[in-house]
């Protein structure tokens, strides 16, 4: 009896996860891949690509180094 309950619960969880994945993919397609009437990608997709490319080119490394003249720490940003 307990195995039947666990099997039913596992099936329900699997169905919910599957529906969630399908709904997420549908939303991504709807928001990001929706082409305008002129055949160009949507502005949201273009903006996302631009931000992704900008993020790759402007990654920064933050190091917290102690300042020798005081007890406070200064934060230095170094571009990679």
Curated annotation (Swiss-Prot):
It comes from Human cytomegalovirus (strain Merlin) (HHV-5). It is found in: Host membrane. This is Protein UL148B. GO terms for cellular component: host cell membrane; membrane. Coiled coil: none annotated. It comes from the Viruses. It is a single-pass membrane protein. The keyword Transmembrane applies. The keyword Cell membrane does not apply. The chain crosses the membrane at residues 10-30. Keywords: Host membrane, Membrane, Transmembrane, Transmembrane helix.
